[in-house]
UniProtKB/Swiss-Prot annotation:
Compartments (UniProt record): Nucleus
Gene Ontology CC terms, in alphabetical order: nucleus
Protein name: Zinc finger protein 770
Pfam families, per database record: zf-C2H2
Source organism of this protein record: Homo sapiens (Human)
Length: 691
């Protein structure tokens, strides 16, 4: 007997060591054959098979099988744990403590003190919910150890798998909610807009969009939000602002209160909940510490961080600093070179603006044999040259045959003109030297002076006044926002918006907005077209006549050239330039009726790079074929015949696919390409097959 008792005690001790006691489960379910220790547990288990849920919630009418589940559910309606910083409610202590750790990194030191207060609140709110057990009863109810498979099953996570996608979930309710994605069901429907959602929380968030109420208000700037999460993100902006934190601490010192701990900018929260409560409850403090975070003082725009504010263009221009990203990306020497190169390009554009004046000016030099020929003696008298710019008067050429220089007007020297072989570089600035010294002086010797000068940076990205001869457009249109350089052009532009055409033709009644357009139109009614007296050619308008007469030179020879000798001839141009008189000793005998040009002049025109035969030939093309209807002139009879189709309204070329007609064959062929299509094998339909 003693041996048997010892064996029993040994077994009990082994069970105690293994955290296990022998169980006796005599009560078996006749449906699923599960075993239970007590009849109460068996009766509770029968509710699963019958589907009964006798415990109902008075608030939301949700039913449960056990009373403990109902009491735990009722905590969701009361939420006894409230955060003093963000005013958020929690139903249990564990989630509330985790939430407090997010607000403050050093909150773990005060966890014990907070737990005592919260446990006292929890005991009051949870009174009568949980039954207290003794140590022996807890041991009897929970005898299983970690090695027991039932224990590992309870501790296992994500044990509910979806049969469609195989995704795991920790509970059946979350699995059921996930199945709604596959079935496409959205049981929660909005009454106002009939929009449906899978979860009730999503529906509640959506219903806030229909109301103009903003229940969540910031205690610092009084800004309202519909969702609490957006309010929390907004408060982090205040806590990241250094000026806001400094002002908050200063406010605390003046009120002779204990100085709060340093605010954590990384976590974006406060050290304790008392600060948030005082700021929210005291309205005077709210208005005194109202600061818009990271706001530009010029344009009043707000930014998320101080770095973005420093890179803001208005803020950088006001403070005289260059953005940090601009300094990192480029070296200041390269920036200086780029800006100066931009100024040089702006200066060099002047040469392109006066190409027509250069050609006229060049012709007058080529006619002057004094400047081209280097074989003539230096004892000849000085000859006068009438320049192309009549407003500057008459300019003399100095008879120095070694330098071959010519004194020009002041405006031509400022433009950087340097005619090869005629002018020296002493009197005229080159393109490299055309940049003003003022632009170079303001840059500064060091990189800091250069980057801190906003005028230099602005001139690098906008063309200054001194470097380009452009008229400033100061008269804007209030309808289309176009800008014009003078009020007269603005008034002329207003006629487009009003639709007025004040200049009417007396013959056909057609009206125009400008008098120049009316004069050009009246040429079509005249019997005689503009007439060139030299070559006896008629033109359709005065523009063609002026271009023709400006490019031709009238040679009036006093007598025919029979043999080489010393003779005089006059060269006169028909445009605004005054006449040029020159003398020469060498003539080339030409045929009768043709002007005689000096040998040196012909050689210079052939060898001069400025002379272009193609340009001269294109400008002197004669329009000999004139339309009898609109008096328009053409170079060839084929173009005139094609033009007559416009007056006749004929379109002889017809598309065989869509029946569209065209006036010209190229237009018809180009239209045929629109009907091209690629076959499935990748072969393209041929043009002949389409035609």
């Amino acid at each position: 007997m003693m041996a048997e008792n010892n064996l029993k005690m040994l077994k009990i001790q082994q069970c105690v060591v293994a955290n296990k006691l022998p169980r006796n489960r005599p009560y078996v379910c006749n449906i699923c054959f599960k075993h239970f220790e007590t009849p109460s547990k068996l009766a509770r288990h029968y509710l699963i098979h019958t589907g009964q849920k006798p415990f109902e919630c008075d608030v939301c009418h949700k039913t449960f099988r056990q009373l403990v589940h109902l009491e735990r559910h009722q905590l969701t309606h009361s939420l006894p744990f409230k955060c003093s910083i963000c005013q958020r409610h929690f139903k249990n202590l564990k989630t509330f403590v985790k939430h407090q750790q997010l607000h403050n990194e050093t909150y773990q030191n005060n966890v014990k003190q907070v737990r005592r207060l919260l446990e006292a609140k929890q005991e009051k709110s949870m009174y009568g919910v949980y039954n207290t057990f003794t140590t022996e009863e807890r041991w009897a109810l929970h005898p299983c150890s970690k090695s027991d498979p039932m224990y590992s099953m309870k501790r296992r996570k994500n044990i509910h798998a979806c049969t469609i996608c195989g995704k795991m979930f920790p509970s059946q309710s979350k699995l059921d909610r996930h199945v709604l994605i596959h079935t496409g069901q959205r049981p929660f429907k909005c009454v106002l807009c009939t929009k449906s959602f899978r979860q009730s929380t999503h529906l509640k968030i959506h219903q806030l969009t229909h109301s103009e109420e903003r229940p969540f208000q910031c205690c610092f700037c009084q800004k309202g939000f519909k969702i609490q999460s957006k309010l929390l993100k907004h408060k982090q902006i205040h806590t990241r602002n250094k000026a806001f934190r400094a002002l908050l601490l200063k406010k605390r010192r003046t009120e002779s209160r204990p100085l709060p701990n340093k605010l954590n900018a990384n976590q974006g929260g406060f050290e304790n909940g008392e600060i948030g409560e005082s700021e929210e409850n005291n309205p005077l403090d709210v208005h005194s510490i109202y600061i818009v975070p990271f706001q530009c003082p010029k344009c009043e725009k707000c930014f998320e961080s101080e770095q973005i504010l420093n890179e803001h263009s208005c803020f950088a221009a006001r403070s005289g600093k260059i953005p940090s990203r601009f300094k990192r990306s480029y070296n200041y020497k390269t920036i200086v070179k780029k800006i100066l190169a931009k100024l040089k390009r702006a200066r060099s554009k002047k040469l392109d603006n006066f190409q027509s004046e250069k050609k006229v000016f060049k012709k007058s030099f080529l006619r002057n044999c004094d400047l081209i020929s280097g074989e003539q003696s230096s004892e000849q008298t000085q000859r006068t040259f009438v320049g192309s710019l009549g407003k500057h008067g008459t300019y003399k050429t100095i008879g120095n045959r070694k330098k071959k220089t010519l004194t020009l007007p002041f405006s031509w020297q400022n433009m950087g003109k340097n005619l090869k072989g005629i002018l020296t570089t002493e009197n005229i600035l080159s393109i490299d030297n055309s940049v003003n010294k003022k632009d170079l002086s303001i840059c500064g010797s060091s990189g800091e002076e250069f980057f801190n000068n906003c005028e230099v940076l602005q001139c690098g990205f906008s063309v200054p006044r001194e470097n380009i001869r452009t008229r400033h457009k100061i008269c804007p249109c209030d309808k289309c926002e176009k800008v014009f350089p003078s009020i007269s052009k603005l008034k002329r532009h207003y006629l487009i918006h009003t639709g007025q055409r004040p200049f009417g033709c007396n013959i056909c009644g057609k009206s125009f907005r400008q008098s120049a357009h009316l004069k050009r139109h009246e040429q079509t009614h005249n019997e005689k077209s503009p007439y060139a007296s030299l070559c006896q050619v008629e033109f359709g308008n005065f523009n063609n006549l002026s271009n023709h007469s400006g490019n031709n030179v009238n040679y009036n020879a006093s007598q025919q050239c029979q043999a080489p000798g010393v003779q005089k001839y006059e060269v006169s141009e028909s445009d605004q330039m005054s006449g040029v008189k020159a003398e020469s000793q060498d003539f080339i005998p030409g045929s009768t009726g043709q002007p005689c040009l000096p040998n040196v002049l012909l050689e210079s025109e052939q060898s001069n790079p400025f002379c272009s035969y193609s340009e001269h030939q294109e400008k002197n093309d004669v329009f000999l074929y004139r339309c009898s209807v609109c008096a328009k002139s053409f170079r060839s009879p084929s173009k005139l015949e094609r033009h007559y189709l416009i007056h006749a309204g004929q379109k002889p070329f017809e598309c065989s696919v869509c029946g569209k007609t065209f006036r010209q064959a190229p237009h018809w062929k180009r239209h045929q390409l629109t009907h091209f299509k690629e076959r499935p094998q990748g072969k393209v339909v041929a043009l002949d097959s389409v035609m």
